[in-house]
Design a protein with these regions (language model features):
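Metal-centered catalytic cores of metalloenzymes
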Residues: 25-31, 55, 73-75, 109, ...
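Solvent-exposed alpha-helices and their adjacent loops that cap or buttress functional pockets
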Residues: 28, 121-122
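Short, conserved beta-strand segments within well-ordered enzyme catalytic domains
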Residues: 36, 60-62, 72, 96-98, ...
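Divalent metal-dependent hydrolysis catalytic cores, especially in the metallo-beta-lactamase
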Residues: 66, 81-110, 122-130
Length: 130
């Protein structure tokens, strides 16, 4: 089972419950707990003992991403969308699409593609020029 929580919004595959329990890990602490949610996180409870193999961790941030899942950031809008979806499915909740060293025209076209997707992508947060 895969559940992804981003900025208190829950993205999920295979969930029929409004609770998830496991080892909660954040930037300065870790503890056993349970998260209750609807479309947003409603409550986080610490639990003394828990019978779960789950880990609940912050999503990964990739600051230098040339592609993923067989798709390249310089290959157009559809490739960027598929690359973005691939990374999201693996737990990367934020990424900077990184250009390759290329001609001005090719780089400019890639920047236009990124610009057209930045508001539609759930994990594309910007561009890194190489």
């Amino acid at each position: 089972m895969f559940r992804l929580y981003k900025q208190k919004t829950i993205f999920t595959e295979m969930t029929n419950s409004n609770k998830v329990s496991g080892k909660i890990i954040n930037y300065n602490d870790s503890y056993s707990g349970e998260i209750t949610f609807d479309e947003n996180i409603l409550n986080i409870n610490k639990i003394e003992e828990i019978n779960s193999e789950n880990y609940i961790i912050p999503g990964f941030v990739d600051l230098h991403c040339h592609g993923g899942g067989g798709f390249d950031t310089m290959d157009g809008v559809q490739a960027i969308q598929k690359m973005s979806s691939y990374h999201l499915s693996k737990g990367t909740t934020s990424l900077l699409a990184t250009t390759w060293t290329s001609s001005f025209e090719h780089t400019y076209a890639a920047l236009n593609d990124f610009n057209s997707l930045i508001d539609m992508s759930s994990n594309l947060i910007g561009v890194h020029l190489e």
